[in-house]
């Protein structure tokens, strides 16, 4: 049986009275005291003990009430009520310190619970928005497959080129699923080896799968090298993915028949390269230009509800850039267009 504080105090006081009375009775039997003195001492002990019990009750009642309130608070928290409780216990010191420790623990648990809920929601939205990055390679595979099936593509070099594109897009899908797994599981520690990159050849391989779409949509796409750029070392796989996602974004949020420019320049120190992809699309309002790289930010918030999709492509591009010695910046004007610039730092493999 668990006794309350009040019961324990009463038992203690009663036990003290009984013990004292027993000692006085023994003293009387042994004739250490006469009857009158023994009675006086016994009554004095009882009265003093009762007064002690009364005084203790006066001081102990507020403490008991605080303990009861604290108990209610812990039960509410245990039942999942994580709402902040500003109830303050200033005294006694032990109760105050216990309350402070509990509040700190409760705050940390609440933050962790909120973080877990947020991460679960983000992962759910991430899976729901997976179609965003699947559309372009799947559309390319379907388009070239139908062209081969229907006999639209007949020349030998066109057939070979179509097969090359199909293989490339299938590989891109495989890479996409790898990256999706990386995002869902947070950090997998995946790294890429540095490779020697000839930028013009890299851009040709990236732009080739878009050739039919650009012709079909009557678009103009121009690549401009502001200066001659020698081969340099960078992480080829993530760089291809970054540029592909940015190009997908430019095509998606600009009108058919519009122009897309890719401008490449090298800084004077020849240690960084800027690749700017500009469209004549709908633009992004300034206050949302930073948020477009967030994992769960939906692009229709800042652009057009008719476009659908999500900001997953930009999120992946930005994450890959940060992890692989690059940076993406954005500038945009509403109804004028958007420019996404990838700044690459050349890798010094000798160090």
Curated annotation (Swiss-Prot):
GO terms for biological process: osmosensory signaling via phosphorelay pathway. It is found in: Cell membrane. Pfam families: HAMP (PF00672), HATPase_c (PF02518), HisKA (PF00512). It comes from the Bacteria. Its main location: membrane. Residues 61-114 form the HAMP domain. Residues 129-348 form the Histidine kinase domain. Induction: Transcription is affected by Agr and SarA. Also, transcriptionally repressed by NaCL, pH below 6, glucose and the antibiotic clindamycin. Its EC number is 2.7.13.3. The modification Phosphohistidine is found at residue 132. Autophosphorylated. Gene3D superfamilies: 1.10.287.130, 6.10.340.10, Histidine kinase-like ATPase, C-terminal domain. The keyword ATP-binding applies. Keywords: ATP-binding, Cell membrane, Kinase, Membrane, Nucleotide-binding, Phosphoprotein, Transferase, Transmembrane, Transmembrane helix, Two-component regulatory system, Virulence. Signal peptide: none annotated. It is a multi-pass membrane protein. The chain crosses the membrane at residues 9-29, 40-60. It is an enzyme of class 2 (transferase). GO terms for molecular function: ATP binding; phosphorelay response regulator activity; phosphorelay sensor kinase activity; protein kinase activator activity. PANTHER family: PHOSPHATE REGULON SENSOR PROTEIN PHOR (PTHR45453:SF1). Member of the two-component regulatory system SaeR/SaeS involved in the regulation of staphylococcal virulence factors in a strain-dependent fashion. Probably functions as a membrane-associated protein kinase that upon sensing the appropriate signal, autophosphorylates and in turn activates the cytosolic response regulator SaeR. SaeR/SaeS activates the expression of exoproteins involved in adhesion and invasion of host cells, including hemolysins (hla, hlb), coa, Dnase, spa and cell wall-associated proteins (emp, eap, fnbA). This is Histidine protein kinase SaeS. It comes from Staphylococcus aureus (strain NCTC 8325 / PS 47). The gene is saeS.
């Amino acid at each position: 049986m668990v006794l309350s504080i009040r019961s324990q105090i009463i038992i203690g006081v009663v036990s003290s009275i009984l013990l004292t009375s027993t000692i006085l009775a023994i003293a009387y039997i042994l004739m250490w005291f006469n009857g009158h003195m023994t009675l006086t001492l016994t009554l004095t002990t009882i009265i003093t003990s009762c007064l002690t019990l009364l005084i203790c009750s006066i001081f102990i009642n507020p403490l008991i009430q605080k303990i009861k309130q604290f108990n209610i608070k812990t039960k509410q928290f245990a039942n999942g009520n994580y709402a902040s409780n500003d109830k303050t216990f200033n005294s006694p010191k032990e109760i105050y310190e216990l309350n402070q420790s509990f509040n700190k623990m409760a705050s940390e648990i609440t933050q962790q619970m909120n973080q877990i809920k947020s991460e679960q929601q983000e992962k759910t939205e991430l899976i729901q928005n997976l179609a965003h990055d699947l559309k372009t390679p799947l559309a390319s595979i379907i388009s070239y497959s139908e062209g081969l099936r229907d006999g639209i593509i007949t020349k030998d070099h066109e057939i070979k080129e179509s097969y090359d594109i199909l293989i490339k897009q299938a590989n891109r899908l495989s890479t996409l699923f790898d990256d999706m797994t990386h995002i869902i599981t947070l950090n997998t520690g995946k790294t890429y080896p540095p490779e020697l990159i000839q930028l013009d050849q890299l851009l040709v391989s990236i732009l080739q799968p878009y050739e039919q779409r650009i012709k079909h949509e009557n678009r103009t796409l121009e690549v401009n090298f502001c200066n001659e750029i020698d081969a340099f070392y960078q992480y080829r796989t993530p760089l291809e993915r970054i540029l592909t996602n940015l190009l997908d974004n430019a095509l998606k949020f600009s009108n058919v028949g519009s122009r897309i420019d890719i401008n490449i320049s090298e800084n004077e120190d020849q240690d960084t390269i800027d690749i700017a992809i500009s469209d004549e699309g709908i633009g992004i309002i300034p206050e949302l230009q930073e948020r477009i790289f967030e994992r769960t930010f939906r692009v229709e918030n800042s652009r057009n509800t008719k476009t659908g999709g999500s900001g997953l492509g930009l999120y992946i591009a930005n994450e890959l850039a940060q992890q692989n010695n690059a940076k993406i910046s954005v500038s945009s004007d509403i109804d004028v267009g958007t420019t996404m610039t990838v700044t690459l730092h050349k890798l010094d493999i000798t160090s």
